[in-house]
Regions:
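Short low-complexity stretches enriched in small and charged residues
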Residues: 4-8, 73-76, 143, 161-166
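Basic, nucleic-acid-binding surfaces and adjacent catalytic neighborhoods in DNA/RNA-processing proteins
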Residues: 25, 91-246
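Glycine-centered flexibility motif
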Residues: 2, 23, 51, 57, ...
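Phosphate/anion-contacting hairpin/loop surfaces
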Residues: 15-126, 131-134, 138, 143-144
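A cross-family signal for N-terminal binding/gating loops and helix N-caps
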Residues: 1-59, 202-206, 211-246
């Protein structure tokens, strides 16, 4: 259900788990306990444990009784892989925000997070800062196709990697991603260095050459320090680097 993992038990409650950034599920031998685990669910053939690394502890567990209570946890966004092109376009244009914000808003689109929104936008060759109101029909169609293709391909790939086993070593930074988690590395399409926008605990990655016409989007963490001196294009950035190296 969106970004939540839902477990239902016959005659019992529903467990809705949101892993956030650092939460992880592990399958352990039956009855095994760990001081790091914050939840144990014992089964005849093993124990499902929930852990969370880091200090912010944002992972969430809701235990609810009945499907009606479970539905109350649903933010209401449409399922991207089930939506038609027309439905996708209607929801996309419902509010005028940046594409990054709209794609990751659970009230609009269910289950798209930071990593896959980066991959979708790169595949669509659209800027994460582009406003939905300024997209033409061709760009909306391209974004729809990129969303469908990206999510379907990664779903198939991750299922194949798990090969029927419980998935371990889960991470948002995966080999084979085009831009997410690849700051400073070459774009697989054009070879330009992948750029980033940092804010809070998240980082948006994009290719300026493929997605923004060469324009650099201000990295909030650095632009506060550099103020008006922030380079605006890839060319300005390269000139800045060369001057620092000389």
């Amino acid at each position: 259900m969106g970004k939540r993992i839902v477990l239902g038990f016959e005659g019992g409650p529903w467990f809705a788990i949101h892993l956030m950034i650092a939460g992880r599920l592990h399958w352990r031998p039956a009855g095994e306990r760990s001081k790091k685990a914050i939840l144990f669910l014992d089964f005849d053939n093993g124990t499902l444990t929930l852990t969370e690394a880091g200090s912010k502890k944002r992972a969430a567990l809701h235990v609810v009784d009945g499907e009606r209570a479970l539905r109350a946890l649903d933010a209401g966004g449409i399922e991207p892989l089930e939506a038609t092109g027309a439905e996708f376009a209607t929801v996309l244009r419902r509010e005028n925000h940046t594409l990054k914000r709209v794609l990751t808003d659970p009230h609009l689109f269910s289950g798209i997070g930071n990593a896959y929104s980066d991959e979708i936008l790169h595949r669509a060759r659209l800027s994460p800062a582009a406003l939905t109101s300024r997209l033409d029909d061709a760009e909306v169609s391209r974004l729809y196709q990129a969303t469908q293709g990206t999510l379907a391909e990664w779903t198939t790939r991750l299922r194949a990697e798990a090969a029927g086993k419980f998935p371990e070593n889960v991470t948002a930074f995966r080999e084979g991603m085009a831009v997410h988690g690849r700051y400073g590395k070459p774009c697989p399409l054009c070879g330009a260095k992948v750029q980033r926008i940092r804010y809070a605990d998240n980082e948006t990655n994009y290719c300026a050459a493929c997605q923004t016409g060469g324009k650099l989007l201000a990295d909030r963490a650095l632009s506060r320090l550099l103020r008006q001196d922030w380079p605006r294009t890839l060319e300005e950035l390269e000139l800045r680097r060369k001057s620092l190296d000389s």
